[in-house]
């Protein structure tokens, strides 16, 4: 790939953790903090510039401005602010303040009424504070994360539709924002598949991100590392390039949100560009014998993850396999030629939920 190298950015979660760590250090040292080094969820060390640094008695407030890199979204430039007070208790109490959404609907992996600070950023924030507290006389802290202007930013997101009210969400599984939605990233997907072919690899694994790639590697440990390719939202590009490069077997590994979009025939899965079709998912549910009242509940679900929760509770987990079958069939049609496709669905911990193996238009399904 030629041209400018893409610049990565940082998630709202990573910036919040940096701000919280800086505020904790300010309380312990009593000196202005200009920069703070933190460890991201992916274990990478990063140095952040601290914008706001304010000490008022027992409370410190620090902020870090989000740089989304070469894939800026509506939170690019957001000032992630942490207000911290240290305590003697063995607990870090974390809540969202102004500009951080509150959860009002199920299906998001967070309790209703809780601030929309996702589990991995929540863990990272606490870890960074505890790192600073080592060797001090304090054991815990009360932390509030806020985002000035967060309510306005949220209007440009799907938060309100998802039941996230009053601001943005604090997100990020790795701490890094990869520029998936750029033309240059699309080019890198093509290049990665071409490279795999050059090395004699005839089975590739297309994943939607770093987390699903790690899970895919755990599921398929015998494959060459070059077989695993992060396609981001460009699943369609990955399929078409596999055909062009005469790849024998293409495996897709993802979680229910992205796979549900693929089952709906969407081959460019950016969350801002398409939403999950719960009507389609309810139709799939009916096809496997789900009672009508549950099918209606699925149709009214908040997210694809919510659909999964409904199916688990009602005992119809087989829907995950059915989704994988449809994904394999839709991707095969998108390929436009005879190509063998498999699809694996994993949960957020990497557990295999469903699969369709070796689908081909000529042989059908081999489950």
Curated annotation (Swiss-Prot):
Q: Which Pfam families match?
A: CbiD
Q: What class of enzyme is it?
A: transferase
**Which residues, by range, are in coiled-coil regions?**
none
Its BP terms in the Gene Ontology are: anaerobic cobalamin biosynthetic process; methylation
InterPro entries reported for this sequence: CbiD, CbiD_sf
One molecular function GO term is: cobalt-precorrin-5B C1-methyltransferase activity
Q: Does the keyword Transferase apply?
A: yes
Q: In which pathway does it act?
A: Cofactor biosynthesis; adenosylcobalamin biosynthesis; cob(II)yrinate a,c-diamide from sirohydrochlorin (anaerobic route): step 6/10
What catalytic reaction does the record list? Co-precorrin-5B + S-adenosyl-L-methionine = Co-precorrin-6A + S-adenosyl-L-homocysteine
Q: What is this protein called?
A: Cobalt-precorrin-5B C(1)-methyltransferase
Question: Which lineage do the record's taxonomy fields give for this organism?
Answer: Bacteria, Pseudomonadati, Spirochaetota, Spirochaetia, Leptospirales
């Amino acid at each position: 790939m030629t041209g400018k190298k893409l610049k990565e950015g940082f998630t709202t979660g990573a910036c919040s953790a940096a701000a919280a760590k800086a505020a904790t250090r300010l309380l312990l040292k009593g000196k202005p903090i200009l920069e703070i080094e933190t460890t991201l969820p992916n274990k990478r060390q990063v140095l952040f510039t601290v914008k706001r640094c304010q000490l008022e008695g027992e409370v410190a407030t620090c902020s870090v401005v989000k740089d989304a890199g070469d894939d800026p979204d509506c939170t690019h430039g957001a000032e992630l602010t942490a207000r911290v007070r240290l305590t003697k208790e063995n607990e870090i109490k974390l809540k969202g303040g102004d500009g951080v959404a509150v959860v009002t609907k199920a299906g998001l992996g967070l309790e209703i009424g809780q601030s929309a600070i996702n589990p991995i950023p929540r863990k990272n924030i606490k870890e960074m504070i505890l790192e600073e507290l080592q060797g001090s006389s304090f054991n815990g802290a009360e932390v509030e994360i806020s985002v000035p202007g967060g309510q306005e930013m949220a209007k440009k997101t799907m938060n309100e539709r998802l039941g996230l009210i009053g601001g943005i969400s604090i997100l990020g599984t790795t701490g890094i924002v990869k520029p998936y939605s750029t033309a240059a990233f699309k080019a890198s997907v093509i290049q990665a598949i071409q490279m795999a072919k050059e090395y004699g690899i005839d089975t590739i694994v297309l994943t939607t991100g770093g987390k699903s790639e790690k899970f895919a590697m755990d599921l398929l440990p015998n494959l060459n590392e070059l077989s695993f390719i992060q396609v981001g939202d460009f699943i369609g590009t990955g399929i078409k390039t596999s055909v062009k490069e005469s790849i024998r077997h293409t495996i897709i590994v993802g979680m229910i949100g992205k796979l549900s979009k693929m089952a709906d025939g969407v081959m460019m899965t950016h969350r801002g560009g398409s939403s999950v079709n719960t009507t389609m998912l309810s139709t799939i549910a009916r096809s496997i014998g789900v009672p009508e009242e549950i099918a209606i509940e699925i149709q009214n679900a908040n997210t694809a993850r919510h659909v999964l929760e409904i199916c688990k509770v009602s005992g119809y987990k087989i829907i995950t396999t059915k989704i994988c079958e449809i994904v394999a069939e839709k991707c095969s049609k998108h390929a436009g030629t005879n190509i063998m496709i498999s699809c694996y669905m994993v949960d957020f911990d990497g557990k295999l939920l469903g699969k369709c193996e070796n689908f081909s238009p000529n042989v059908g399904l081999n489950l």
